[in-house]
A protein has these predicted regions:
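Extracytoplasmic low-complexity segments
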Residues: 21-82, 123, 187, 201, ...
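Extracellular/lumenal carbohydrate-interaction signature centered on repeated Trp-anchored short motifs
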Residues: 30-35, 89-101, 123, 155-164, ...
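Extracellular glycan-recognition modules
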Residues: 32-36, 40-58, 81-140, 148-149, ...
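Extracellular glycan-interaction surfaces
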Residues: 56-82, 102-111, 130-196
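Flexible glycan-contacting loops in extracellular carbohydrate-active proteins
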Residues: 70-71, 189-227, 696-720
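Glycan-recognition/cleft segments
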Residues: 116-142, 195-197, 621-648
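Beta-rich carbohydrate-recognition and catalytic domains
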Residues: 242-403, 407-454, 465-511, 534-587, ...
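Beta-rich accessory regions
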Residues: 259-261, 494-505, 509-513, 522-532, ...
Length: 728
């Protein structure tokens, strides 16, 4: 049923009264508008929505359908990666002279491209109208008049995580385009004379995705992220009086509470006790800090693109370093020096108690450093209006410039930043400040040697005092034609702006490479604690199917031995998450013998003490399937003195990693070895003798690929085994 509204406009004070669907405003200069289409999203739970004027229903596509409290009744949440509503409407319903669109939006993330809230356009037909958002949260109106493409963009950005009422009027008849935000006109532009172009017959429409089509690599980048409600299309012109009347139909919007109850119950690869965002892409962790009973960790985040583009700062919190909850993103690119992305950085509690961060901003041409501050324990951050405090890299480096890490020592803030010199190798540059505002460049703190395999660029540097006067200096070499990205470190002293290493050649952090870019902090008990990223290294298609990419490690505790080697153990807080204990007991293991353990699981901790006996190899099997033959084999090889992570038979999918990785490690045949294994969906973490650590990822396809076993080759051994299920 067409909703008919007759408005009489006043040039002075508005005194309104209502009679059914008629509003009178001082009865001056009548204007007629009609409601043509409406989506109110008040359906209770099914996977479709109804357009109320025609009664037609349309499916909601995407990974899951999440309804939430809206402006009036329910609203619909769009994940920014997969959710959209598509259909067609009869073109005869749509006017070609004047049209007004009203909708309520609460964006969670801004897009990489131009995301549509409502699109009635077609990439090929050169017709229609689209109302959406760009990467800065500005309202974008795209439309065709007499087949010619036109675009109007607001100078004002709408806020994230808060309801905003958007009204857009397009009138070739009066040659105007008007954009209202919360009933206030924020943009008024010209439109060419002519007629709004519509296709003949039916007009395709999309809610939550731009029908014009926009991609970056393998991913579409025009999905809307956040909540939408009360989408209405009117004939007639949008004026301040019309905006006031439409807005007056609604009360004051409440706080936004997104329904992020994404159903991962059918995803065997999703972890339950490793830190991971609700969905989307994640990268390096940093800024791990403890404040007033809560741990905060920040990370590279993108909810609307599974890769590097328009990164922002994600935020996780935890009471104990194990059970993490995602909070709202705290830093977002804005026009200017950080418009192309907020890259990594560090968090620090300033000497006056202010929670602060320092971060890398990029504008598309160069990187600089800026700061931001919090007045609510890191729930929000306010950028420093003087940013960038360091606008560009020093002249003596000629590669990238990013990833600041800061400490306070001897009355100064000391900051190192990753960089490099192409002809020499990776390095970190060094700055100091008395007030966290004015920074003095002090030169290159430490220069690597590209000829020694140390890479040409270093990222994610760490300078951490692990014991009295003894520092860890850790960097990550970026991948090159000699080796992948890998973390290595020196230990030594840091005095008077100089780091003096205890040994010449760096040590690798991992036995088998797979754990990168650790965030390092002191926990509430004074222990050095680290959490890093464990990439999935699967295809973009597989990531798109999952709806997320990468995750973070369980917390580790680091100590140093006398030789300056970092000893790595799982954090003791993990013990609190142990569930059922399964005592396997003592096992005698013979070469070729299988089914030594009667246990199946995807989320558990296994502690095994091996008496390695005469075996040439000893290890364990995960993700074992009787139906497909899939299995993930992890073992120590005495003949090569290596730990081996063999994923060659771990999956029947061609979209995931199925490689074999090795890492040198010295063990004596016949010795006793304690191995602590954490399995959580697709991720593996192994701790050896409470000293060393390595990781892996595996993605079996079969439903029964959850078998666990121990094995030996070339001799015999024994093991004492206890398994705990892990609950979270």
């Amino acid at each position: 049923m067409i909703f008919l509204l007759q408005i009489f406009l006043a040039s002075t004070l508005f005194a309104s009264c209502y009679d059914d669907d008629v509003v009178f405003i001082d009865e001056i200069d009548s204007l007629r508008i009609e409601k043509l289409l409406e989506f109110n999203f008040d359906e209770s739970s099914d996977d479709s929505v109804t357009e109320t004027s025609t009664g037609e229903t349309f499916p909601v596509e995407g990974k899951s359908v999440n309804r939430m409290d809206g402006i009036s009744g329910n609203a619909l949440f769009f994940d920014g990666l997969s959710n959209e509503i598509n259909g067609q409407i009869n073109t005869s319903l749509l006017p070609d002279d004047e049209l007004t669109i009203s909708l309520w939006a609460s964006p969670r993330s801004f897009p990489v491209g131009t995301a549509a809230m409502l699109a009635m356009t077609s990439e090929d037909s050169e017709s229609g109208i689209m109302v959406g958002l760009n990467k800065f949260g500005q309202i974008v109106v795209q439309y065709f008049v007499d087949g010619s493409f036109e675009e109007t963009v607001s100078t004002t950005s709408i806020p994230r995580n808060r309801w905003s009422h958007i009204i857009v009027g397009i009138s070739p008849a009066t040659q105007s385009v008007n954009i209202f935000l919360n009933e206030e006109e924020i943009t008024s532009g010209g439109a060419p004379s002519g007629s709004i172009t519509w296709p003949s017959g039916n007009t395709p429409f999309s809610i939550g995705k731009n029908t014009m089509g926009e991609s970056l690599g393998d991913f579409e980048i025009d999905f809307y992220s956040g909540a939408l409600d009360e989408i209405q299309v009117y004939s007639g012109s949008a004026t301040p009086a019309v905006a006031e009347f439409i807005g007056g139909q609604y009360g004051t919007p409440g706080d936004v509470d997104y329904n992020l109850g994404i159903d991962y119950s059918g995803d065997p690869h999703r972890p339950i006790y490793h830190p991971i965002p609700d969905y989307g892409w994640t990268n390096e962790s940093y800024g791990l800090v403890y404040l007033d009973g809560t741990y905060h960790m920040f990370f590279q985040k993108n909810e609307v693109f599974l890769g590097i583009a328009q990164q922002n700062w994600g935020h996780l919190t935890s009471p104990d370093l194990v059970d993490w909850e995602e909070q709202d993103a705290v830093l977002w690119p804005t026009e200017g020096w950080d418009q192309a992305g907020i890259w990594s950085g560090d968090a620090i509690i300033l000497e006056d108690g202010t929670p602060a961060v320092i971060y890398t901003g990029v504008d598309g041409n160069r990187a600089g450093m800026g700061t931001a501050f919090s007045s609510d324990n890191y729930q929000t951050l306010e950028k420093n209006p003087n940013n960038p405090l360091i606008p560009a890299a020093p002249e003596e480096v000629d590669l990238d410039f990013r990833d600041p890490y800061v400490i306070h020592k001897d009355g100064l803030y000391h900051m190192i930043i990753g960089s490099g010199i192409a002809a020499e190798g990776g390095n970190v540059v060094y700055y100091t400040s008395e007030d966290f505002e004015d920074w003095t460049y002090e030169g290159i703190l430490f220069q690597g040697d590209i000829n020694q395999g140390q890479g040409e660029f270093w990222e994610m540097p760490v300078l951490h005092e692990i014991s009295d006067g003894r520092f860890i200096f850790l960097v990550q070499k970026t991948p090159d034609n000699t080796s992948p990205a890998i973390s290595f470190y020196w230990t030594g002293s840091f005095e008077n702006g100089e780091f003096i290493p205890e040994f010449e050649n760096p040590k690798y952090l991992e036995v088998v490479n797979g754990f990168l870019s650790p965030a390092v902090a002191i926990d509430e008990e004074g222990r050095t604690t680290a959490i890093g990223i464990i990439p999935d290294e699967v295809s973009p298609e597989f990531q798109q199917q999952q709806g997320y990419a990468h995750l973070f490690s369980i917390p580790q505790v680091w100590t140093l031995d006398e030789e300056g080697t970092i000893l790595i153990e799982p954090h003791p807080n993990l013990v609190d998450y142990r569930g059922e204990q399964v005592n396997i007991g003592s096992l005698n293991l013979e070469s070729g013998q299988e089914d030594n353990i009667d246990f199946n699981g995807k989320h558990f901790e296994m502690n095994a003490t091996f008496d390695t006996g005469t075996a040439d190899r000893f290890g364990f099997v995960l993700g074992k399937s009787e139906t497909s033959g899939e299995e993930y084999r992890v073992y120590y090889d005495f003949t090569t003195q290596e730990w081996v992570v063999d994923a060659s038979d771990s999956s029947t999918s061609d979209l995931v990693r199925r490689d074999v990785r090795r890492g040198s490690f010295s063990l004596s045949q016949g010795s006793t070895v304690d191995v602590q294994v954490f399995v959580d969906g697709s991720v593996l973490e192994v701790f050896v003798d409470g000293k060393s650590h390595f990781t892996g990822r595996f993605f079996p396809e079969s439903a029964d690929a959850n078998g666990v076993d121990l094995f030996v080759e070339g001799g015999s051994a024994s093991a004492d085994v206890t398994i705990y299920t892990i609950e979270n």
